[in-house]
């Protein structure tokens, strides 16, 4: 499922081989056919932290057959790839492992994560934030926009400025990962059909892109994207809740009130209650426990050395 937001870059790569120097490249190649693939210190770190324990593969070298040829994209920078891989393990994988157990991630995590340096832009100007393919692969874009010297993870602003710099890691990466992971859980174990009825008749199937995030709560949605359909609504509530503080969540609920009308707030709270029950009864964990761990780990990562593999 594509996660798309409103907010061309064209790149043509040609390779020429010229026998004019015996110098070895100073950095690992960004292309997949490099002979050093799977033999660098970082590749060994990935095997130790992702492949061996969880059967998860990180694709960071550019592979054109792994990307949508409709779009022109560029490879991710190595220093940003390493930083994102370390953060993803600490905030995402280890958070679920701490709350639900490592076997949960081993069983249900997507098997492939692909890092792309730039964004994908549709013909209508919309930016593709991330994609998921059948619960097996998640692609994350804009990796090169990360400032690894100034990591920013905003858990207190429910309606962030998407154009702000440094980029918000929650908005651009971790929200998307939790969103897509919830889709895997939905597909594995059916969620209560009652959820679909709460906002029935209010979804914007064809024009959700025109629904502003800050206005969506009045209609009972936590983001504009959530107003597209019930499945996305559920994934947006889940990913928004787990990446924001209770105070930020309350701001969303307050935005669902106008005068004496609390129907927007009521709808969001009703749907959240259904999600919490679903996760506890079908998956054996409390959403509030997961949020506490995610928020704690998001703070911890700000103190981590993201430039080394230690």
Where does each model-flagged region fall?
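Auxiliary, metal-adjacent structural segments of Zn-dependent hydrolase domains
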Residues: 24-25, 82-146
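Active-site recognition of the HExxH zinc-binding catalytic motif
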Residues: 140, 154-192, 235
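Acidic, glycine-rich loop-and-strand cores that form catalytic or ligand-binding grooves
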Residues: 174-216
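Metalloprotease/metallohydrolase-associated module, dominated by Zn2+-dependent proteases
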Residues: 203-310
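C-terminal motif of bacterial Sec signal peptides marking the signal peptidase cleavage site
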Residues: 15-19
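Sec-dependent signal peptide recognition
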Residues: 2-10
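Acidic/polar, low-complexity intrinsically disordered N-terminal segments immediately downstream
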Residues: 5, 21-102, 106, 261-263, ...
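Second-shell loop/turn segments in exported
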Residues: 70-78, 148, 160-168, 172, ...
């Amino acid at each position: 499922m594509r996660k798309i937001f409103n907010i061309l870059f064209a790149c043509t790569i040609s390779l020429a081989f010229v026998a004019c120097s015996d110098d070895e490249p100073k950095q690992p190649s960004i292309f997949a056919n490099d002979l050093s693939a799977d033999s660098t210190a970082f590749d060994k770190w990935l095997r130790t932290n992702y492949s061996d324990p969880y059967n998860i593969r990180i694709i960071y070298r550019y592979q054109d057959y792994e990307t949508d040829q409709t779009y022109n994209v560029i490879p991710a920078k190595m220093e940003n790839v390493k930083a994102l891989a370390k953060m993803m393990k600490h905030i995402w994988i280890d958070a679920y492992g701490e709350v639900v157990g490592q076997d949960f991630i081993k069983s249900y995590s997507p098997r492939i994560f692909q890092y792309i340096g730039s964004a994908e832009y549709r013909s209508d100007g919309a930016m593709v934030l991330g994609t998921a393919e059948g619960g097996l692969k998640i692609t994350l874009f804009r990796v090169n926009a990360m400032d690894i010297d100034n990591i920013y993870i905003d858990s207190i602003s429910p309606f962030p400025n998407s154009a702000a710099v440094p980029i918000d890691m929650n908005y651009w990466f971790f929200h998307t990962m939790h969103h897509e992971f919830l889709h895997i859980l939905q597909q594995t174990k059916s969620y209560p059909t009652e959820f679909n009825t709460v906002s029935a008749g209010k979804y914007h199937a064809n024009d959700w892109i025109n629904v502003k995030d800050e206005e969506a709560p009045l209609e009972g949605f936590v983001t504009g994207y959530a107003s597209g359909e019930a499945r996305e609504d559920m994934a947006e509530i889940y990913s928004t809740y787990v990446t924001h503080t209770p105070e930020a969540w309350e701001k969303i609920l307050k935005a669902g009130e106008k005068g004496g009308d609390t129907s927007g707030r009521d709808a969001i709270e009703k749907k959240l209650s259904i999600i919490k029950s679903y996760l506890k009864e079908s998956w054996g964990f409390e959403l509030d426990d997961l949020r506490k761990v995610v928020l704690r780990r998001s703070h911890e990562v700000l103190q981590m050395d993201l430039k080394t593999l230690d």
